[in-house]
Regions:
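AAA+ P-loop ATPase motor domain of ring mechanoenzymes
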Residues: 1-139, 147-272
Length: 272
């Protein structure tokens, strides 16, 4: 009965609320939500390093109610979170699809899943966000199988006919189909945090975790992290649930550990 009136994502949310309220009524704690569409607790587009004014882009989309964006850059740089924030600014539902949701081992099934995703977004008036879109938009000139070409063709066809807001994100800009790139109204590069953004996020998270503000030594350490992203802060906050962070020094150390597993951390960062 619920599913007859709601789309798949709204149905899941309604069921979660129903189960949670039932658990509370029975004297248990509420169901912990793991909503993948939820924004980080600390979110501000000013703390996203992009090559355009993200707030201005959002304002333009609010007015136009239509647009096709390609967000590219390193993992954790804030691409998916920006799509979530855009949906909030537009006041529309968010429909997130990942490559694993759309890819199928059966011939022709991936194309059907792509068409279904756009149809679902159209019916719900939702912003459609497809993550890892490079899985479907590889340059057709290098295709070795017919289905690789047909998947790109289906994605392009659906993009052309979709009148809402479509956001695609990828970590791999190289090798994307040139015709596909031309279909996007705007291509936005996301990058590692600038030093001023890293310091701002550090201050916000110290406040959110009930910690004292960072001292100059800790500020200097955070400013030297060249591969720091908002995703690193989010990972450390998740760690805090089972590995409590008790000081700004510990927070910076945890962020340094996140960056240490990445490549290219041996160059200095300055205020840009």
């Amino acid at each position: 009965l619920i599913q007859a009136d709601l789309g798949p994502q709204k149905t899941a949310a309604a069921l979660e609320r129903l189960i949670s309220s039932t658990m509370e009524a029975q004297g248990h704690g509420p169901l912990l939500s793991h909503d993948p569409n939820r924004l980080p607790e600390v979110y501000d587009p000013d703390f996203i390093h992009a090559d355009v004014d993200l707030a201005a882009v959002a304002a333009g989309l609010v007015a136009a109610r239509s647009g096709r964006l390609c967000l590219y850059g390193p993992p954790g740089a804030g691409k998916t979170a920006y799509g979530r924030w855009l949906a909030q600014q537009l006041g529309v539902p968010l429909l997130v699809k990942r490559a694993s949701d759309l890819k199928s081992k059966w011939l022709g099934e991936s194309e059907k899943n792509i068409a279904k995703a756009f149809r679902e977004a159209r019916n719900e008036g939702a912003l459609l966000l497809i993550d890892e879109v490079d899985s479907f938009l590889q340059d057709r000139r290098g295709a070795q199988h017919n289905w690789e070409v047909s998947e790109v063709n289906e994605m392009l066809t659906q993009m052309e006919s979709f009148s809402g807001v479509f956001v695609a994100s990828t970590n791999l800009m190289e090798g994307l189909d040139q015709a596909a790139l031309r279909r996007f109204d705007l291509k936005v590069k996301f990058d590692f945090l600038r030093a001023d953004q890293a310091l701002g996020l550090l201050s916000r998270h110290c406040e959110g975790l009930g910690l004292q503000q960072p001292l100059p030594e800790e500020q200097a350490r955070i400013s030297r992290l060249v591969s720091l992203t908002p995703g690193d802060f989010a990972a450390v906050v998740r760690q805090h649930r089972f590995r409590p962070i008790t000081s700004a020094t510990a927070l910076v150390s945890a962020l340094e550990a996140e960056c240490a597993v990445k490549h290219g951390t041996n160059r200095a960062i300055g205020f840009l």
